Amino acid sequence: YHAARFEQLYQGEGSGHPIDDLQSLIRNELPFETYMELAEWYESVGCTEEALSLLSCAGNYPIALYKQAYLLHQAGNDDESRGMLQRAGALSPAMVFPFRPSSLKALEWAKTVQPDWKIDYYEALIRWANQDKAKALELLENCGEADYAPFYLSRASLKEGESRLADLLKAEQIEMSWRTGFALINHYVANNQWQKAVETGKKYTKKYPSNYYIGLKYAKALCETGQYQPCISLLSRMQVLPNEGSYAGRAVYREANLYRAMEQLSHKNYKQVVKSVETSKEWPENLGVGKPYDNMIDNRLEDYLEAKAAAGQGDSRKTSALLAAVADYTISRSHFESGNLLSALALRESGHVP
């Protein structure tokens, strides 16, 4: 237990290098958070020296430096406190994600001594992490201009409409990271601005060709703008990492092929309809999701379209068989599905109902 080891070392038991001995066994991904957690307890019981000793182990973690500055100020050591504030203010906010409400007092004090947009940003992240989104947005709005793209991405997440878009575009001006591109595409998709989504997707897919988060959104935008073959081609080159619930790639793949089949059906190109329908039934391995058991797949739309193509080709036997498959699909769910309408149409077209 790190707290027990710290007590032993702080009391003089060990090798004579207490800080080195303590740090030697703290090997987690975010060691500074361990020191922050321990220091918080010592501060809460009035053991300022112990808290400062632990915070010093956190290195150049800005929140730890602000905490040290605050505790030094409380102890009357204002010269060293100002030095800590200057160190903290000079550091980048990259990968700094504070969440402890106990850090708020130090940050609020720091703003009165050395105002800096980063302090408001850190405080906003803490407020946000503790479900006070309104206060978080208020703090972010008061920050003024910042030269840090994630600041604008964060603020955009708390906004809506044109105000949100303005922050996303500002983030893009500062840094065209994949996260900026992903946020922009998501904004356009959410607002049904499909052509903008296509333009943004094309730009960022070119810059980040192996990023399937962007690629899937771009593919969806291509599908929604009627560019079915480019969508299918893009999906064929994509490698989606398999993960639980990763159905998006296969869903767009199916949609693009079925929309293409419907387009060809309107032109009476029946052979291509059948080809597109058969392709839509595939479960490409590169799209990150495995094929379920056959009895778990609802192919009514595929079969219905293929029945229409067979009817156009004059193949009455195949038409009847496909319509029967649609009509006989076992409906086990209590709620109505759009596929149920196809079953009803198939029954009527088969002559089973008037």
Describe these PLM feature segments:
Residues 15-16, 48, 78, 100-103, ...:
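TPR-repeat structural position
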Residues 7-8, 41, 71, 126, ...:
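Residue-level signature for tetratricopeptide repeat
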Residues 12-13, 45, 75, 130, ...:
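Structural motif corresponding to the intra-repeat A-B loop/turn of tetratricopeptide repeats
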Residues 2-7, 37, 67, 122, ...:
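"A position-specific structural signal for the A-helix of alpha-solenoid helical repeats
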Residues 1-3, 34, 64, 98, ...:
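TPR alpha-solenoid repeat register
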